[in-house]
Amino acid sequence: MMLAVEDVLSELAGEERNERGLPPGFRFHPTDEELITFYLASKIFHGGLSGIHISEVDLNRCEPWELPEMAKMGEREWYFYSLRDRKYPTGLRTNRATTAGYWKATGKDKEVFSGGGGQLVGMKKTLVFYKGRAPRGLKTKWVMHEYRLENDHSHRHTCKEEWVICRVFNKTGDRKNVGLIHNQISYLHNHSLSTTHHHHHEALPLLIEPSNKTLTNFPSLLYDDPHQNYNNNNFLHGSSGHNIDELKALINPVVSQLNGIIFPSGNNNNDEDDFDFNLGVKTEQSSNGNEIDVRDYLENPLFQEASYGLLGFSSSPGPLHMLLDSPCPLGFQL
């Protein structure tokens, strides 16, 4: 055990002890085997250990939430010596009741071996504290591991009120799950900031589904620069009608639905002028010959509710002029 050596070294160095009797930085986290073969055995056969302060408590007279203040060892887990209180003078059943509730055993007792699977040295019992009285007690987060000697070690101690050593702790939350959720939230937050700052055009669903054929016919679509203007007149009017129809066929149906909302008169033809709206032309001719400003329609609250629903938003993310001034997927601009 290195604790005694560290005690001597810390005293020679003049280190200040903490309130638990350990040098700064030391924590009391013994294994199941160490609790039984060293601490419990020393208590039973030698009355305890010099310099190791583990409190003796009567677990039937103390509620679990009172135990941390009584402990001399442990921070998140608290350790105690206790005498098993027999329920009946001639019986072997243990009294587990307190004033506010009772300890109830859960699962089977676990065998504790020495040397990684060697000799059986003791048993470990897990108990959970319930408020109230059985069988209608209310389960709490307080858990106790009770360790006792077994086999040859237990036969050496003939006293019926045998000593046990207990580890008590409160399961007030699964730290692994909390950590996972925190990491997920941090990832989503950082990913959102990165996407908004560097790839703002990815905030909307893709309106173009590229294919190998399209990328061959239109090399400019290979570039993913949101500030590059791909809807110039040279591109539109210098291309054949076949190529334009091929490009129009790749437009997501969302665009067609938006056009249907803005121009319900069915003024959609299969010519190049009709295709101009999808590529950024902001005016259109109505059925009576008057020029229509597309922004008037886009700023209409009824249109905003309908169009954002088609784009997958539950509600409008902000003023529409911000969306109009922002880069759209693959260079398209509304």
Curated annotation (Swiss-Prot):
Outcome of swapping P30S: In cuc3-102; cup-shaped cotyledon and abnormal SAM
Keywords attached to this entry: Developmental protein, DNA-binding, Nucleus, Transcription, Transcription regulation
Cellular location(s): Nucleus
InterPro entries: NAC-dom, NAC_dom_sf
GO molecular function terms attached to this record: DNA-binding transcription factor activity; transcription cis-regulatory region binding
Residues of the NAC domain: 22-171
PROSITE patterns assigned: NAC
A cellular component term, taken from the record's GO annotations: nucleus
Domain of life (superkingdom): Eukaryota
Tissues showing expression: In a general manner, present at the boundaries between mersitems and araising primordia.
DNA-binding region: 121-177
Domain notes: The NAC domain includes a DNA-binding domain and a dimerization domain, and confers the specificity of the transactivated target genes.
Name of the protein: Protein CUP-SHAPED COTYLEDON 3
Source organism: Arabidopsis thaliana (Mouse-ear cress)
Lineage of the species this protein comes from: Eukaryota, Viridiplantae, Streptophyta, Embryophyta, Tracheophyta
